[in-house]
Curated annotation (Swiss-Prot):
Protein name according to UniProt: DNA-directed RNA polymerase subunit Rpo10
Top-level taxonomy: Archaea, Methanobacteriati, Methanobacteriota, Archaeoglobi, Archaeoglobales
Chief localization: cytoplasm
GO annotation, biological process: DNA-templated transcription
UniProt-listed Enzyme Commission number(s): 2.7.7.6
Length: 76
């Protein structure tokens, strides 16, 4: 079953792994601010992300959906 996905945020966590704060809805806006030339610090400050654990979620996120999709159906 093919599920339509937003390529920008489809694999970004909905909640922070450490504190559980809901952050997933902010990822697209974060990426937009970066594309406008803002630094990660400026973007996160403007979004109101203050906790270090939540900031880490944005700064260290690496999308691997395309790489993993090559193996869809290969196991089994």
């Amino acid at each position: 079953m093919d599920v339509p996905r937003n390529e920008n945020s489809s694999d970004f966590p909905i909640r922070c792994f450490s504190c559980g704060a809901v952050i997933g809805h902010l990822y697209d806006e974060y990426k937009q601010k970066l594309s406008e030339g803002k630094s990660p610090k400026e973007a996160l400050d403007e979004l109101g992300i203050e906790r270090y654990c939540c900031r880490r979620m944005f700064i260290t996120h690496k999308s691997v959906i395309k790489e993993l999709s090559r193996f869809h159906g290969a196991v089994g």
